[in-house]
Amino acid sequence: MESALALPRLPPHDPGTPVLSVVDMHTGGEPLRIVLAGCPEVSGPTLLAKRRYMRQHLDHVRRRLMFEPRGHRDMYGAVLVPSELPDAHLGVLFLHNEGYSSMCGHAVLALGRFALDFGLVPATPAGTREARVNIHCPCGLVTAFVACEDGRSHGPVRFHSVPAFVLATDLMVDVPGHGKVVVDIAYGGAFYAFVTAEKLGLDICSAKTRDLVDAASAVTKAVKAQFKINHPDSEDLAFLYGTILTDGKDAYTKEPTTNICVFADEQVDRSPTGSGVIARIALQYHKGLLELNQTRAFKSSATGSVFTGKAVREAKCGDFKAVIVEVSGQAHYTGTASFIVEDDDPLRDGFLLK
C-alpha cells in the first residue's frame, strides 16, 4: 500500500520569495532543465545580445538552477526567450556549469518534444506524423522534426544543424603529461577538439571517467593556449567548448563509434553529444571518410546511449566549406519542480564541489 502525505503546493515561504518552475528531461542520459517561470525578462535585440545580458545581469538564475543544492556539477539547462527571427517558434539560451553554450544537440532533441507538447508551435493537423519546430539557438536557426501522434510527441526527434565545418586538422598540440598530440578542430554549432583516446594512453570504453576527464581537460587547456579559434560570423561563437575523445573509428561502418565529451568546466556529457556528432560528421566528410546521407551511429562511453547522424547537404559558412547535418535521438521527461530561494539562505545562489 502506497503511503501519501498531504502537502501544500510549496513549503511555507514569504510571498516575495523567488520561485523557479522547471520541467526536467533527459536525452540519452544527459539532463535538460527547462525554465518555465521565475526567470526575469532577458533583454536584448538579438539572441546573442540576450545571451550577453543574461551572463552579465542574470547569472544568479543559472547558478541557482545548475549548481547544488538544486542541481549538480553536470546539470544542463535552457531558458526560453523570444527570437528576432520571423521563422523561429522559440529562442533558447543554454546553461551549464561554466556559463552559456552556443549550441546543444541533446537539448534541441528534448526541446522539440517540449515545444510540441506545451503548445509552443501551432497545432498539427489530424494525421500528421511529424511536426516541425524551428528553434533559434545562439549559433543560428535549427529545425527539429518531432514524431507525433494525435498532436503529441511520440518517439524520436531529428534536427538539421547550422552549417558545420572543419577549422583545423592534424594540429600538433603540446599537452602537458602527454607530449605532442594530434588534434582536429571542428564546428557543429560549437567548436570541439577531437582526439583519439588511444593517443592519450586510454581505452575509451574501459578507462575510468576521471582519467578521461583529466586527459580531455588537458587537451582543452592546451588548445586554448596554443591555437586561436575564429568563427566567420561572430566573435561570440569563437571559443573552444570542449574536447571529445573518440575510439578513432572515423571510417564509415554500420557499427557505432564511441566517444565522450568533456566540456565547459570539466562537465561530462552523458549522451553522445548532439553538437559533437554534428562536428564529427563534418570532420569525417571533410576527410573523405563519409558520403552524403550515409548514416553513422555514435555511442556514449558514459551511458551507452546512441545518436545517429548524417550529412544531408553541402553548405558554406563564410569561406569554409560546410555541411548540414541531421542528428536523431530520443528525449524523455523525468519530472517537474518548483524551487524556492529564501533570502536568509547563505547558499541560495548555489555551490559546486570538485
Curated annotation (Swiss-Prot):
Q: Where does substrate bind?
A: G105, H106, D269, G274, S275
- The answer to keyword Lyase applying to this record is yes
InterPro entries hit by this protein: Pro_racemase_fam (IPR008794)
Q: Which GO terms describe its molecular function?
A: hydro-lyase activity; trans-L-3-hydroxyproline dehydratase activity
- The UniProt entry annotates the active site at C104
Gene3D superfamilies attached to this UniProt entry? Diaminopimelate Epimerase, Chain A, domain 1 (3.10.310.10)
Superkingdom of this protein's organism:
Eukaryota
Write down the EC number: 4.2.1.77
Mention any additional remark: In contrast to the T.cruzi proline racemase enzyme, lacks the conserved Cys at position 273 which is replaced by a Thr residue, transforming the racemase activity into dehydratase activity.
The annotated subunit structure for this chain is:
Homodimer.
What is the protein named? Trans-L-3-hydroxyproline dehydratase
The organism named in the record is Pongo abelii
Name of encoding gene? L3HYPDH
